[in-house]
Amino acid sequence: YEELCVYYLMELLILTHRLSSEKPRKSNLLTMQEMEQAVQYFSQNYNSPINIDEYAHSHNFSISWFIQSFKQYTGTTPTQYLLFLRISNAKNLLENTSFNISEISRAIGYENPLYFSRIFKKQSGLSPSEYRKKYQIIM
């Protein structure tokens, strides 16, 4: 009788371990899908005003959970990711178009070209005009 109890107890422990190790995988998969959707949304809408708090609430996420999960998934916060997208696209426009700074600023989601220039210089070390002179592809 004692051996049978030990056997059932071991079975129960093994089953509990399997179930507990499966739940994080499902949860992690769901989190990965949710974060991939956020990345896609930000990538497609970086040039529009995006409020991180509103995005989190609209997807029924707590703000802190969303920011933490996004950072685990991408290595950066949502705000930093949006900034990266905007500056990367600004660099592309500076290199490959003749758009003026105001047009580029609006194209990437900044209404104020002076604010854009300040952010751009802080991120790249060069003003948008200096960057263009240095890296523009001759057309």
PLM regions and their residue ranges:
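Residues within the alpha-helical elements of helix-turn-helix
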Residues: 58, 107-108, 123
